A protein has these predicted regions:
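Transmembrane alpha-helical segments in integral membrane proteins
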Residues: 11-27
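Juxtamembrane loop-transmembrane helix junctions in multi-pass integral membrane proteins
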Residues: 2, 27-34, 59-66, 91, ...
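Interfacial helix-start motif at the membrane-water boundary
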Residues: 1-13
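Interfacial segments of alpha-helical transmembrane regions
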Residues: 26-41, 94-99
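Short, intrinsically disordered C-terminal tails of secreted or membrane-associated proteins
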Residues: 150-157
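Small-polar-interrupted transmembrane alpha-helices in polytopic inner-membrane proteins
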Residues: 37-52, 99-110
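Membrane-proximal helix-loop-helix units in multi-pass membrane proteins
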Residues: 45-88
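Terminal transmembrane helical module of multi-pass membrane proteins
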Residues: 86-150
């Protein structure tokens, strides 16, 4: 219970809240950014729900276990198009766009296709680290972008 709360519910819930706060920052952005943010917000909700619906190794066919697996799939399936839409919507910020596209491709590779044998735990943890790191950088970039008026020069020191 405590592991699920600390590993899934708390971080996913905080990212869900962060995405909701970012909505103000992107309300003047193009639709790609707004839709991308909505999809990555859904990804954060699915991540948090993995902790609410624990995976039981003894009863993999149980309803809670099936729902946990469904939330795990929704986590990365919602993230990929969300990150790619944010990359397309932030083309003027080349670094952010390239990073979003790269992470959007790497997360499912690490979460789904790389976990074989010894790599199972490590690959999934790397996918989580990439996902969390992406959230931190994108949040910072979107907040900094919204701090200046439209069509003005970027904030000083950036």
């Amino acid at each position: 219970l405590w592991f699920n709360l600390g590993a899934f519910v708390l971080p996913g819930g905080l990212l869900l809240l962060q995405a909701q706060l970012l909505r103000k920052a992107v309300q003047e952005a193009n639709w790609w950014v707004r839709l991308g943010l909505t999809l990555v917000q859904l990804s954060a909700l699915a991540f948090a729900m993995q902790g609410v619906l624990p995976l039981d190794q003894r009863g993999v066919d149980a309803a809670a276990s099936r729902l946990h697996v469904l939330m795990w799939m929704l986590w990365w399936i919602a993230f990929v198009p969300g990150a790619l839409l944010l990359a397309l919507g932030q083309r003027q910020r080349r670094g952010l766009a390239v990073m979003s596209a790269a992470v959007g491709v790497l997360v499912p590779l690490l979460a789904v296709w790389a976990p074989i044998g010894v790599w199972v735990g490590l690959a999934q943890r790397l996918a989580f680290v990439l996902w969390f790191g992406w959230w931190l950088l994108v949040s910072r970039c979107l907040i900094c972008t919204s701090a200046s008026a439209p069509k003005s020069s970027p904030p000083a020191g950036r």
